Amino acid sequence: MSNIIKYKKKILNGDLLTKEEVEELLEEGITDLAATANEIREFLCGNKFDLCTIINGKSGRCQENCKYCAQSSYFDTDIIEYNILHSDRIINSGISNYNKGVHRFSVVTSGRALNNNEVDTLCKTYSKLKEICSIRLCASHGLLKYEDLKRLKDSGVTRYHNNLETSKSFFKNICTTHTYNDKIETIKNAKKAGLEICSGGIIGLGETMEDRIDMAFTLRELSVESVPVNILNPIKGTPLENQEILSYEEIIKTLALFRFILPTVQIRLAGGRALLSDKGKKVLESGVNGAISGDMLTTLGIETSEDIKMIKNLGFEV
């Protein structure tokens, strides 16, 4: 019996793979790996697809030095800078996305964390939006304290986003102004506040496949509900502007392995999808059951109507 069949049976029986077992799958062919990951997804998660959109609620002037990010004040990019968007702009965007058939809507803000006044402002916005429509609210506001995370929860936010970005051992190569443990503490505080967790990372930063596997196992230990996987889109002016873009085969292999490691979570194809020739269709057949639609924070994405059509054609329920 091949490893891929053996480990598929183990997962479908309710057991989790060890890191050593996952590493054995690295030698498997991509076609078989992707197809089996999709079988695991269908058996354990069904065909329901989770579609979300984001809005850049505060842009630029970030004091952190994440090497991939156009919003960092350390780098000379052409990013448009602004403070917290007006409440009406956020609410109208949420309603518009709900009417398009999107399930979740997240406000994402630049910076290490919001200050008290900014949290107050956004909590009022979340409360208003919750009253108007039933789109599920997510938030991504950096390394917030427990008290602020609880306020978000009380305002109608159901899920908090904070990416690990990469493995603990590789993180220092990407950012030095905050630590991996800072991120983990924020995630734990968000869970304590009663929020679901959306946490994943970026692939193509220069990390190895082993780094990606390590990150996935850390996410499993943290019991996150959603794992967004971004493909690096190198941005001019950042230290990674000349980073080579991953091959499509490497992307498919990574997402498929994530399904073997995280058999029951929402694995979400996120930023960088517009770089792919088929807009991510093959990846969506490799164990994925979620995606971010529309534009990203500082790069263009894919129209939601186009996404929904493609997702339905693949047999998913949206």
UniProtKB/Swiss-Prot annotation:
Gene3D superfamilies in the record: Aldolase class I (3.20.20.70)
Radical SAM core domain residues: 44-273
Pfam families: BATS (PF06968), Radical_SAM (PF04055)
Cross-referenced SUPFAM superfamilies: Radical SAM enzymes
First-tier enzyme category under EC: transferase
Family matches, as InterPro entries: Aldolase_TIM, BATS_dom, Biotin_synth/BioAB, Biotin_synthase, Elp3/MiaA/NifB-like_rSAM, rSAM
SS bond partners: none
Positions with a binding annotation for [4Fe-4S] cluster: C62, C66, C69
Catalytic activity: (4R,5S)-dethiobiotin + (sulfur carrier)-SH + 2 reduced [2Fe-2S]-[ferredoxin] + 2 S-adenosyl-L-methionine = (sulfur carrier)-H + biotin + 2 5'-deoxyadenosine + 2 L-methionine + 2 oxidized [2Fe-2S]-[ferredoxin]
Cofactor: record remark: Binds 1 [4Fe-4S] cluster. The cluster is coordinated with 3 cysteines and an exchangeable S-adenosyl-L-methionine.
GO biological process: one example: biotin biosynthetic process
Protein's job: Catalyzes the conversion of dethiobiotin (DTB) to biotin by the insertion of a sulfur atom into dethiobiotin via a radical-based mechanism.
Quaternary context: Homodimer.
The family this protein is said to belong to: Belongs to the radical SAM superfamily. Biotin synthase family.
Protein name: Biotin synthase
Higher taxonomy: Bacteria, Bacillati, Bacillota, Clostridia, Eubacteriales
